[in-house]
């Protein structure tokens, strides 16, 4: 098991370790309460710099016209991506040890809420240079291991994957914590909130929820499911170990999910097959033209062409899998005259 001493280090021990933690679950599952307790414990026990970014605290004021207003799905997605861009600006400042610049294109209200979020957690402070506002990193942000905990529903796997991509881009640690709270409990808690969500919204999220699945998605291997908020304190050691493991094993930029690699291989193979097919067709066509002057040769080539067409699939099996020829044609003389033997082709 990793220890805090392995992670904390000093300035001479190399670059500071940084990570992103996705905290997901249904609305009113207890994520915000859990995140605050986790941040306090890690600051006290591990000496880390922790930034909790609660999406509900940063995003609503940017678009809410009324207490229960909600943006269209497409607008919501754009706002989430914009918030990830803000996080990237902060991470670039931390990694490069420089001031945090202001995005040229931003939703002003959401940007201000994001800045307030970081200031309140002692990660940045305001400064002015040459009459331009900028934000400087605090000593806490640059001198300690840093973990950003993103608190949101993240009910779609694709939402969490966007955070993973950000971790991969900057070689950060990445992990996921899923609070698996019963739907009935979430509905009861939601009903007690001043600005409660419609119950049907939570029911819909419950049906659409895609839980972390490390067996299916290799990039989700650093994931931990906490059965209910009541068990959060009992899982504290597991949570700490998960975060330590993530910091010690940052996502490599060159790594990608296995599905994408398989897709790339298929595309590559398809391109090779297409080019090979074009080459074979060109060779057959040219040979036919050259044989037209000789009737006997032309008749033989006509038969050969028919044979190639009839055994097209078998030829590709040889190219792809180096298999034995399984010809539908009984005329094996074609194999002999072409000097193709009924055995696996040499790979040399």
From Swiss-Prot:
GO biological process terms held by the UniProt record:
translation
Give me the reactions it catalyses: L-seryl-tRNA(Sec) + ATP = O-phospho-L-seryl-tRNA(Sec) + ADP
Q: Which domain of life is it from?
A: Eukaryota
Quote the EC number: 2.7.1.164
User: Binding positions for ATP?
Assistant: 25-32
Q: Which family does it belong to?
A: Belongs to the L-seryl-tRNA(Sec) kinase family.
Q: What is the protein's known function? A: Specifically phosphorylates seryl-tRNA(Sec) to O-phosphoseryl-tRNA(Sec), an activated intermediate for selenocysteine biosynthesis.
The molecule here is called: L-seryl-tRNA(Sec) kinase
What high-level taxonomic lineage is stated for the organism?
Answer: Eukaryota, Metazoa, Chordata, Craniata, Vertebrata
What gene is behind this protein?
A: PSTK
